[in-house]
């Protein structure tokens, strides 16, 4: 590689590094002849080569300058020497002195010519010659400085990357955890995963709860719209006290129960009946399930739940048997319908004496037979132990449910579970027909009259909607998701049956095309054991909804209550509870052109800022039926707020 620089005389000198030479070889500068022909150059290009900093504007003056800078002293014995040519027969010493005099005269004449030439040049041109020379040198120095800075930054980046990479590798090797594309760092009871995945996923800190829902798939949490709310110092507190009395062998009688309603209504009823059995020190016979409800599902308790786990988990709380002892099989049970929203005193004073008298009692209803509030802590904690630990779904439901969760988590991404309760039975029951045709509205009214135990027959659907009593339509749901800035690429799991109304799902499908359900995610072979078993299918939906990053429900039914309460219990996972009354007013204002989309979105986000599943205390109401359900919010009762010291101990 060649390098060059300007010599002190302005002539570029080229240094060539060659393996043939131990040091750099300097090329000869261009030579110029002395004598009368010195006024012109053999090549016009010599102007810019020979002049140090010249601009070539005055060729004659430049040539003079070049002659000064490159005069060559010839040896005295050269054939061209003036001494030899001018003094052939004279005294050598005199000739030498004469030659010296002539040489001094020649140099004097040359200096005089140069000075005159410079004086004849305009002063600006002279200054320009020198300023251009300095400018050129400054440019070279700036270039070298720039190259040096770039080199320094490059070396620094390489060193820093190498150090950081070695530090990360060292941390990973210390943990001895290695799976493709994911680095795991264990910390206390949680695993922290750093995602370093594809182009569409930003590197995100993800927490995987190792103790969530038993053996179910890991639940990931992301930032932005997918992030869970702050849970503060709250934690689960349902473990039995160490000082409690051991369960004795004696019993006051046997309880037979028939859990009524759909899947989640039956769950609540079973939880209450376990607590009632505890209050009365009774033995519970394995529950039977309602087969006469709207869904007409003939699944039994053992089909829906892991019955052996149920008995084992509660063995220290109550006695549970599969069936009545043989000596009591012939006894006619005493039939009793407990009063709704009752407290402990009612069961001890009014029901327990009857149980002791008849030994075997059959309770006809189980739903809402215990109050939400004002119960002993031991009773509340037991209800939660039943709901969140003992009532584990049967193996077929658990296994397929977890498969559906893994299929929803494509590339470990988040998904939203949407409980879109826009089904025919719900619309008929509530009398809501907004956006439906007149024919569809009439069909719903006829269905309402056909179901005898539905008390309300004539309902003003418009008024009910404005009061927040209707499930959101698919279009309204789409507007809500868009206003909250969920991306159109969001993966959504539909926790519901078929939506009612011709084309009612079109707006939601258009805005969010990645919508799935158990019938889409599972094969026909996988779903064949669940055909005609709506409660088992509801169990699948429950598992997928529970493990989602975000759960959104459009109507506050039993499924919504059960899932949101369970998600609160599992460290307050994000659950969007729409303010339907105010939201539909905003939708109407948007449709009527009274507000812009920007204003609409801003108001929707403000409206739901604190409706995301964050902790707050359930409070007693004037009427038990109007209170918030204990199973929708088990705080207080099953979730406790720790002190700072307790929180620190829990984290360590």
Curated annotation (Swiss-Prot):
Keywords assigned by UniProt, alphabetized: Carbohydrate metabolism, Fucose metabolism, Glycoprotein, Glycosyltransferase, Membrane, Signal-anchor, Transferase, Transmembrane, Transmembrane helix
Main location: membrane
Enzyme Commission number, as recorded: 2.4.1.-
Glycosylation site residues: 233, 460, 502
InterPro entries documented for this protein: FucosylTrfase_pln, GDP-Fuc_O-FucTrfase
Gene of this entry: OFUT35
Keyword Signal among record annotations: no
Transmembrane segments: 138-158
Protein name as it appears in the record: O-fucosyltransferase 35
Bias type Low complexity, positions: 85-98
Molecular function terms, GO-annotated: glycosyltransferase activity
Any one of the GO CC terms: chloroplast
Binding site for substrate: 419-421
Topology of the protein relative to the lipid bilayer: Single-pass type II membrane protein
Top-rank taxon, per record: Eukaryota
Disordered: annotated segments: 1-64, 78-102
GO biological process, one term: fucose metabolic process
Pathway: Glycan metabolism
Locations listed in the record: Membrane
Stated family: Belongs to the glycosyltransferase GT106 family.
């Amino acid at each position: 590689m060649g390098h060059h620089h300007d010599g002190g005389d302005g002539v570029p000198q080229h240094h060539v590094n060659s393996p043939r030479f131990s040091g750099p070889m300097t090329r000869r500068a261009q030579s110029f002849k002395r004598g009368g022909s010195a006024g012109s150059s053999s090549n016009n290009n010599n102007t810019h080569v020979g002049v140090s900093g010249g601009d070539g504007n005055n060729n004659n003056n430049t040539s003079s300058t070049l002659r000064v800078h490159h005069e060559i002293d010839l040896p005295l014995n050269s054939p061209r020497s003036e001494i030899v040519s001018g003094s052939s027969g004279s005294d050598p010493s005199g000739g030498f002195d004469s030659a010296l005099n002539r040489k001094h005269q020649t140099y004097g004449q040359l200096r005089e010519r140069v000075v005159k030439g410079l004086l004849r040049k305009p002063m600006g041109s002279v200054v320009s010659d020198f300023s251009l020379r300095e400018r050129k040198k400054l440019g070279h120095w700036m270039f070298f400085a720039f190259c040096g800075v770039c080199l320094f930054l490059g070396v620094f980046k390489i060193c820093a990357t190498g150090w950081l990479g070695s530090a990360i590798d060292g941390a990973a090797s210390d943990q001895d955890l290695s799976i493709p594309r994911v680095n795991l760092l264990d910390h206390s009871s949680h695993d922290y995963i750093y995602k370093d995945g594809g182009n569409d996923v930003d590197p995100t800190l993800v927490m995987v709860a190792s103790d969530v829902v038993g053996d179910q798939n890991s639940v990931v949490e992301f930032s932005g719209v997918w992030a869970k709310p702050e849970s503060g110092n709250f934690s689960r507190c349902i473990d039995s006290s160490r000082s409690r009395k051991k369960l004795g062998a004696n019993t006051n009688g046997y309880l037979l129960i028939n859990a009524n309603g759909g899947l989640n209504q039956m769950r609540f009823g079973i939880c209450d009946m376990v607590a009632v059995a505890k209050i009365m020190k009774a033995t519970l016979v394995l529950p039977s399930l309602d087969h006469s409800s709207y869904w007409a599902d003939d699944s039994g308790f053992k089909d829906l739940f892991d019955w052996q786990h149920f008995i084992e988990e509660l063995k220290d709380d109550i006695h549970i048997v599969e069936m009545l002892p043989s000596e009591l099989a012939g006894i006619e049970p005493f039939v009793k319908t407990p009063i709704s929203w009752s407290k402990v005193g009612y069961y001890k004073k009014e029901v327990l004496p009857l149980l002791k008298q008849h030994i075997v009692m059959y309770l006809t209803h189980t739903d809402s037979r215990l109050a939400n509030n004002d119960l002993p802590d031991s009773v509340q904690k037991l209800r939660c132990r039943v709901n969140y630990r003992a009532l584990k779904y049967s193996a077929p439901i658990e296994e397929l449910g977890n498969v559906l969760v893994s299929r929803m988590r494509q590339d470990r991404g988040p998904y939203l579970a949407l409980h879109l309760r826009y089904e025919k039975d719900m619309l008929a029951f509530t009398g809501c027909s907004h956006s439906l045709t007149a024919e569809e509205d009439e069909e719903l009214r006829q269905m309402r009259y056909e179901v005898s135990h539905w008390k309300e027959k004539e309902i003003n659907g418009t008024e009910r909607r404005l009061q927040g009593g209707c499930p959101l339509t698919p279009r309204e749901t789409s507007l809500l998701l868009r206003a909250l800035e969920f991306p159109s690429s969001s993966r959504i799991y539909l926790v519901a049956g078929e939506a009612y109304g011709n084309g009612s799902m079109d707006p939601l499908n258009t805005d969010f095309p990645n919508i799935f359900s158990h019938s889409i995610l599972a094969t026909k072979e996988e779903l064949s054991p669940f055909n005609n078993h709506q409660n088992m299918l509801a169990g699948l939906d429950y598992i997928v909804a529970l493990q989602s990053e975000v759960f959104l429900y459009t109507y506050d039914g039993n499924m919504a209550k059960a899932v949101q309460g369970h998600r609160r219990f599992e460290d307050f996972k994000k659950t969007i509870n729409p303010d339907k009354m105010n939201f539909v007013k905003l939708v109407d204002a948007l449709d009527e052109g009274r507000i812009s989309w920007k204003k609409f979105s801003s108001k929707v986000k403000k409206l739901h800022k604190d409706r995301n599943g964050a902790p707050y205390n359930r409070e007693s109401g004037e009427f038990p039926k109007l209170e918030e359900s204990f199973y929708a919010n088990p705080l207080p009762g099953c979730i406790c707020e720790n002190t700072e010291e307790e929180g620190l101990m829990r984290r360590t």
